[in-house]
């Protein structure tokens, strides 16, 4: 095994989710030298495995006023700085005949106290503005919910961090912490692409690894007690609702239907699991049944809608040090300065929270880093727009007005003001790779050159290749060829990655493999094995 020379920086961030990316951006904007390490790809943990809800905070108003206030504040900030990552759909909290209508008044009052706009509307009006809603509803409240693309949001933060000097090392797994006495001064990493190992040095290391943060802390012989909660979701094959639809009751299973990009999602379940199971993302038949049964109560059209795939993620719920049983685990933001907590300097853990509050979590963590380094520059991430959101979409669309509407619309929706740099180029760049999501060859090249793409799976999260109705059936081979053309992969690697990509798609389809989904999967298998000669896929563990 080869060992590379060490690198030095001011701060090392472990974890490539939204929080880690946000910390990298904040630190870089404050003039710090930053290295971020992620064992897989960006947004492969809880960040990329949630429902993409741009919380207004209304969901938490009754049960957690502090979280509700944080959410509405960050909601308003993201609508300013991340316009190309969010869609202000608004949301409806509906009351069904089986629910307690009197809860609506409690709900509205709690929203008002948290600073959240909540307007009771007539059920008939709710049916007009959201035709998919259950017509049997007896009450509705309109709130400023929306949707956010977690992959796009994370990539934009990473891109801004890189453009301000940060080094982003994906496919690099932390194998240990480097210590000098009672101080952490770096990490040891292994590059999964080359097998090389390397020592990275910095006076501050930030553990932003989410649920895996407990394992990272153990490298320093520290104990962070986490209680993993698995949440499962289903994706519809098209967008069936235009507003976020919630049940007006205390949070429960399968009570949010979220429209996002070209699809809708129903979620989530909540199941405590053993820590040893955090990498097992299988969705069970029982969870699928719950999601379908409860989801149809929100929008009856779900009963006639094809389910595209299922997936799950694990929330990092943190117990306080004096609560070993986990009876009172927190869903709030948890910031641990291990110098104060454990007598170990140079090491900080940021965990808990939610996608909605990633920027606030990053601000807290970066403030802690700067205190240690004597850096007095203020946080500016609430005011500075992310790459892609630095001009209105209408202005960007006018710059590419001569191009076909589906291409320019989809590209600007995903990449905002960065689109004209590549979409207006030659004929090849405008050629379609993925018809379902209108992804072009130019978009693939842009992602390769700017967004840390090392594989087909990486490309999926940057461009939505393979995330449409065909689940890669018609576009995966084209995308694999382009990655080879753009010198990301060799011929042998392209074939291996194609097989890996299709197997990953199947893992999400398998829990709902009936009817059209099963027929399409069989057709995909025939195309790649029978027609293209791809070797039989590795036997799936499912």
Model-assigned labels for residue ranges:
Residues 52-125, 129, 255, 397-404, ...:
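Dinucleotide-binding Rossmann-like beta1-alpha1 core, especially the glycine-rich loop
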Residues 150, 160, 225-232, 240, ...:
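C-terminal catalytic lobe of FAD-dependent flavoproteins
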Residues 14, 200-210:
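Short hydrophobic core segments
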Residues 207-221:
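Flavin (primarily FAD) binding-site architecture
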Residues 7-9, 194-204:
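Core beta-strand elements of the Rossmann-like FAD/NAD(P) dinucleotide-binding domain
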Residues 11-35:
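N-terminal Rossmann-like FAD-binding beta1-loop-alpha1 element of flavoenzymes
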Residues 28-48:
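Glycine-rich FAD pyrophosphate-binding loop
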Residues 94-164, 169-170, 176-183, 188, ...:
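Flavin (FAD/FMN) cofactor-binding and adjacent substrate-gating region
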